């Protein structure tokens, strides 16, 4: 792992740890801060080594063998070879909402996950375009920081829920005055926004890069553009109802429509802009669509 990625990962983990500790302090004072810091250290360790398993479990994703999904394995193996990385494991998510994501610490232990809905919606070329995009995240070593962010942001949301319950049902006396209540309200409002901004910071530019890298790996920018349009349209009418919004940045298209309240705070670039960039890449490759 390059120095730049180590620095980005360290900054991310430090910031999220500080956010967790701050929320802990607002909930339980010094004792809450100590507990939150202990949880943060534990979560950092667990998320580094087991974050891929955690994310897969959130979506009941199942690792499938070549015998179970021969065509899918063939596509993943071919594109991984063209990208110059080891073949990732292959997982299928049991939902008809079309989407895909990659997870893992690095190319040596990565997983590419696709939903059942994606396999039903896309043709072969479009599926290759999507998988090439996910392979690119692995090749560009985005998966570690994306997965860490998902797990730690998920922990933040759990503490925010706890803070909300503490605010509603907690008993406050003169020693814990209105300042504590105001602090809890600020935590409830601002912590999710901070988590979203972190996702935004690590996601948007990397999505453009994965689009470009994937298009060049597969040689089919037009197929990826078509896939993005189909996925976007399907999610508009059938968003993912169950799942953790903290993982939104991991998917090729945000599956949680309605979570982002403005393009400014979207975890993904607008699909139209991604397609326009793919058109330019296609022209460079001598492809018109």
UniProtKB/Swiss-Prot annotation:
<keyword id="KW-0812">Transmembrane</keyword>
<feature type="binding site">
    <location>
        <position position="207"/>
    </location>
    <ligand>
        <name>Zn(2+)</name>
    </ligand>
</feature>
<feature type="active site">
    <location>
        <position position="134"/>
    </location>
</feature>
<keyword id="KW-0862">Zinc</keyword>
<feature type="transmembrane region" description="Helical">
    <location>
        <begin position="31"/>
        <end position="51"/>
    </location>
</feature>
<dbReference type="GO" id="GO:0008270">
    <property type="term" value="F:zinc ion binding"/>
</dbReference>
<feature type="binding site">
    <location>
        <position position="133"/>
    </location>
    <ligand>
        <name>Zn(2+)</name>
    </ligand>
</feature>
<comment type="similarity">
    <text>Belongs to the peptidase M48B family.</text>
</comment>
<feature type="transmembrane region" description="Helical">
    <location>
        <begin position="182"/>
        <end position="202"/>
    </location>
</feature>
<dbReference type="Pfam" id="PF01435">
    <property type="entry name" value="Peptidase_M48"/>
</dbReference>
<keyword id="KW-0378">Hydrolase</keyword>
<dbReference type="GO" id="GO:0004222">
    <property type="term" value="F:metalloendopeptidase activity"/>
</dbReference>
<protein>
    <recommendedName>
        <fullName>Protease HtpX homolog</fullName>
        <ecNumber>3.4.24.-</ecNumber>
    </recommendedName>
</protein>
<keyword id="KW-1003">Cell membrane</keyword>
<keyword id="KW-1133">Transmembrane helix</keyword>
<keyword id="KW-0645">Protease</keyword>
<keyword id="KW-0472">Membrane</keyword>
<keyword id="KW-0482">Metalloprotease</keyword>
<feature type="binding site">
    <location>
        <position position="137"/>
    </location>
    <ligand>
        <name>Zn(2+)</name>
    </ligand>
</feature>
<dbReference type="GO" id="GO:0006508">
    <property type="term" value="P:proteolysis"/>
</dbReference>
<keyword id="KW-0479">Metal-binding</keyword>
<dbReference type="InterPro" id="IPR022919">
    <property type="entry name" value="Pept_M48_protease_HtpX"/>
</dbReference>
<dbReference type="InterPro" id="IPR001915">
    <property type="entry name" value="Peptidase_M48"/>
</dbReference>
<dbReference type="InterPro" id="IPR050083">
    <property type="entry name" value="HtpX_protease"/>
</dbReference>
<dbReference type="GO" id="GO:0005886">
    <property type="term" value="C:plasma membrane"/>
</dbReference>
<feature type="transmembrane region" description="Helical">
    <location>
        <begin position="9"/>
        <end position="29"/>
    </location>
</feature>
<feature type="transmembrane region" description="Helical">
    <location>
        <begin position="143"/>
        <end position="163"/>
    </location>
</feature>
């Amino acid at each position: 792992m390059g120095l730049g990625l180590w620095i980005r990962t360290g900054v991310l983990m430090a910031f999220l740890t500080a956010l967790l500790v701050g929320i802990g302090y607002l909930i339980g004072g010094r004792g809450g801060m100590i507990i939150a810091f202990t949880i943060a250290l534990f979560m950092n360790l667990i998320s580094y080594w087991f974050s891929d398993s955690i994310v897969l479990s959130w979506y009941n994703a199942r690792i499938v063998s070549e015998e179970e999904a021969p065509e899918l394995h063939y596509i993943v193996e071919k594109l991984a070879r063209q990208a110059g990385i080891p073949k990732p494991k292959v997982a299928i998510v049991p939902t008809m909402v079309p989407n895909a994501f990659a997870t893992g610490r690095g190319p040596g232990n990565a997983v590419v996950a696709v939903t059942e809905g994606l396999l039903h919606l896309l043709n072969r070329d479009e599926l290759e375009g999507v998988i090439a995009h996910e392979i690119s995240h692995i090749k560009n070593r985005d998966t570690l920081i994306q997965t860490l962010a998902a797990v730690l942001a998920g922990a933040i949301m759990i503490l925010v829920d706890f803070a909300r319950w503490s605010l509603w049902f907690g008993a406050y006396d003169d020693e814990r005055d209105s300042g504590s209540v105001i602090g809890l309200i600020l935590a409830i409002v601002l912590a999710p926004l901070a988590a979203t901004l972190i996702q935004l910071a690590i996601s948007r530019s990397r999505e453009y890069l994965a689009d470009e890298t994937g298009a060049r790996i597969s040689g089919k920018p037009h197929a990826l553009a078509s896939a993005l349009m189909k996925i976007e349209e399907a999610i508009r009418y059938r968003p993912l109802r169950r799942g953790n919004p903290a993982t939104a940045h991991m998917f090729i298209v945000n599956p949680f429509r309605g979570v982002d309240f403005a393009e400014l705070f979207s975890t993904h670039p607008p699909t139209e802009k991604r397609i326009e960039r793919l058109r330019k890449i296609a022209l460079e490759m001598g492809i018109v669509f």
